[in-house]
C-alpha cells in the first residue's frame, strides 16, 4: 500500500501528490494529531489496505472542524479501522440483498415474457424482437436512444465488403458463455442470466404493460407501482456499482434525477427521505422485497461495540452519514 500526498493543503485541486512509504504515511497522520493504540498494527493494516480506502473516505467525518490544516482531536487510527471493516461487512449483506432481488427479477421477467410471447419453439427468440416491447415516447430522447441501441436488440452489422462489423448480441453471447452456446436458439431464461443489472433494469423499463404487470405482481405490486419499482431498481443498481468498486457504502448518497421524477414515486411508496437519498433509504427499499433484520442487527452491533469502546461519538457520526443519527430510527 502507498500514499499519494499533496504538499500544499491550501490548494483546492493539487497538480499531483508524492509517494510516501508506510512509515511516512504514519508520520503524516501523527503530525495531524491522530492517536494510535499500536503503530505496528497500523502499519500492518496499511500494507494490506490502501491508505485512500482506509483514511481518505472517512477523514472529512473525523477531521477537526474550523482549522486551516488537516487536524484530529481525540481521534484514533483504530476508529478508522472500525469504520472501514464495518463498511466492508455491510457491503456483504447489501450485495446479498441486491443479488436476491436481481435473481428474482431475472426469473420473473424471463418466465412472464416467455409465457406471453415464447410458448413454442418457433417463438423462442421473440425476446430479441423490439416489437414485443414498449418503445419509450419519442420526446424522451435519452431513453429512445437506449431503446434503439439496447443489447437484446443488437443485430449483426456488416461492412460494404461483407465482413462483420458488429455481431448480433446473441451471437456474441454464444461465444462468451458456454451455457448459452450449447443452444442453437437459446431460450430467454438462459440468456437473461448473462445480462448485467444495468441491462436487466432497461429490460424491465422496456417491457410492455402486459408483461410488466405480471412481473410486478410477482413482487406484490400492481402496474400503478411501475414507476416506483423502476426507481427502486435504479437505486439498487447504483448501490451495486458502489459495492462492486469497493467504494464506501456507508457514505452512499444519490441525488434526484429528472428522468426518474426525482425518485418521488419510490420515496412515497417506501417512505424515503424527501431530499438526497442515503444508505437508510436503500434499507427501506430492501424492506419492500423482504426482511432486513440481518442488516439492522449488524448496524446495532457496530453501534454498541463502539459504545463499549467509549467511542459513541464515532458511531453517531457514522450512522448520521448513513441517513439518521438516532439508532432507534434504524
What are these regions (language model features)?
Residues 246:
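Acidic/aromatic/glycine-rich contiguous surface patches that form carbohydrate-binding/processing clefts
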